[in-house]
């Protein structure tokens, strides 16, 4: 066995443009700067197809990032995952689907679907909606309604009627005297419901009024609404179409009533989170929800694992096999993992392929530092000192051949949008990194430094000439650094992603990499 290895994951730290919104560059980080200037290093792709997401417009996140880091493979996430769960039927066996449909069957409640109506496959796919509608009819659900968001962004700009006609044909085939399957409301995706990054809560509120309260301009059908708006507003494209409510005799066909079941069928998270919060959270305060007391709500996927948005979802993340931990346990390698509460699940559960518990109790030790319960911008160092204390202590014990830690600061403070706090957060991470490097020298470790996705590196964004605070992840690559003065490692030329980290670790240890893994970088 070669030297033991310690891996530091700086959560939310990518390569920015060096401008005023790049908190990584703005911060005083002498240790990170020196490592990057003097050590073998490369930049890893940490978003989109490199982490199993459908397109390279999809930002990475901590969950898929740690999946890729910990398994050396690229697993389907998002659209592919939903498609597979519909094909195998596992979606309909999920506790959440059963709960929502039972609520309708036993309590006479309606089932509502909300989502983007197209086959763009970026946020949603109409085929997923149609499959669930057919299943609901097969199960005998009597009242099922669709609240449709028109696309024109991931598909041709004025293609809405193709999808509406397709959906109406399906709904007609499922309806009879006993069963009502109808479109109830809708509007353009850039006008209602699908805001992101908390940029425009009134847009979400307009969606709420339209779908839930049935308020708005009434039409006999979605087709009539679309054709009317196009005639009144020449040149208007689908994403900008105004809200509409389908009505009969002056009354909405269906409002979303308290106690109903609601499924948000978008699988991409960024534009699904705010409406999810409006349905899910008792303490919601971004707008007045009227007499709302609650529904049984589920998203297609978990849109944010850190913030638990939504509370319930239909499709579980993938169960990943042949993880790094499995390979190391087979080889008898002792492992140590540490973070604070905010990312503890990421260096354990997500790292181990979405599996709770340990692969081998006798070989793995985990440590969790309880996170602060105050807003992170108020204490941007978070628990970096305590994490470092535990990691250095574990290194000094010489018990472990592979240790990993996650500093959440760049991501969790990054999400607050408070630039000065993010700069302080980065400096705290660098202070921790300096101590880990010192321990690596003292106790004879190879030190690896990387991240799971960007965030702190892009705190500002400019749209239509206006610069505003950005709180979302970036699409920027993340560093991968090897610090080991005793071994002159060379990183091979190539385009690498997060899934190349595990094979590199195994290669350094002189172990065999599984055939299904990505290649090592050395």
Residue ranges of predicted features:
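Feature captures the catalytic ectodomains and active-site-proximal regions of enzymes
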Residues: 1-522
């Amino acid at each position: 066995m070669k030297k033991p290895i310690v891996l530091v994951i700086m959560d939310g730290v990518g390569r920015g443009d060096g401008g005023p919104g790049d908190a990584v560059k703005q911060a005083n980080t002498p240790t990170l700067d020196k490592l990057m200037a003097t050590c073998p290093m490369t930049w890893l792709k940490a978003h989109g197809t490199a982490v199993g997401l459908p397109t390279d417009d999809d930002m990475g996140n901590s969950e898929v990032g740690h999946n890729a880091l910990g398994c050396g493979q690229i697993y389907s996430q998002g659209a592919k995952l939903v498609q597979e769960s519909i094909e195998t039927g596992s979606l309909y066996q999920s506790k959440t689907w059963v709960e929502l449909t039972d609520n309708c069957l036993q309590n006479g409640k309606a089932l509502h679907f909300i989502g983007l109506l197209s086959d763009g496959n970026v946020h949603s796919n109409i085929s997923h909606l149609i499959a669930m509608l057919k299943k609901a009819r097969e199960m005998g659900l009597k009242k099922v309604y669709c609240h449709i968001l028109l696309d024109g962004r991931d598909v041709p700009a004025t293609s809405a009627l193709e999808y509406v006609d397709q959906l109406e044909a399906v709904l007609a085939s499922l309806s009879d005297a006993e069963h009502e399957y109808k479109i109830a409301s809708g509007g353009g995706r850039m006008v209602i419901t699908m805001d992101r990054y908390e940029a425009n809560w009134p847009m979400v509120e307009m969606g709420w009024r339209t779908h839930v309260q049935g308020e708005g301009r009434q039409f006999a059908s979605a087709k009539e609404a679309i054709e009317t708006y196009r005639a009144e507003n020449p040149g208007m494209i689908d994403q900008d179409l105004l809200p509409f409510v389908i009505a009969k005799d002056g009354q909405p066909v269906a409002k979303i009533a308290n106690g109903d079941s609601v499924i948000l069928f978008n699988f991409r998270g960024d534009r699904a989170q705010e409406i999810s919060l409006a349905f899910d959270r008792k303490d919601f305060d971004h707008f007045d929800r009227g007499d709302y007391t609650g529904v049984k709500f589920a998203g297609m996927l978990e849109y944010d694992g850190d913030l638990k948005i939504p509370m319930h979802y239909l499709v579980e993340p993938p169960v990943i096999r042949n993880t790094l931990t499995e390979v190391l346990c087979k080889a008898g390698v002792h492992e140590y993992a540490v973070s604070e509460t905010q990312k503890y699940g990421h260096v354990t559960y997500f790292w181990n392929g979405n599996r709770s518990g340990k692969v081998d109790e006798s070989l793995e030790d985990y440590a969790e530092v309880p996170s602060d319960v105050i807003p992170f911008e108020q204490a941007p160092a978070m628990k970096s000192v305590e994490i470092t204390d535990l990691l250095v202590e574990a290194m000094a014990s010489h018990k472990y051949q592979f240790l990993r830690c996650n500093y959440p600061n760049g991501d969790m403070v990054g999400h607050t949008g408070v630039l000065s706090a993010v700069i302080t957060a980065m400096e705290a991470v660098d202070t921790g990194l300096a101590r880990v490097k010192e321990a690596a020298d003292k106790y004879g470790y190879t030190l690896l430094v990387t991240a799971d996705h960007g965030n702190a590196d892009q705190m500002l964004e400019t749209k239509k000439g206006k610069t505003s605070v950005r709180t979302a992840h970036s699409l920027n690559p993340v560093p991968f650094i090897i610090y080991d003065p005793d071994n002159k490692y060379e990183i091979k030329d190539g385009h690498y992603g997060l899934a190349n980290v595990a094979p590199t670790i195994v290669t350094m240890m002189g172990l065999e990499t599984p055939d299904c893994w990505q290649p090592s970088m050395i």
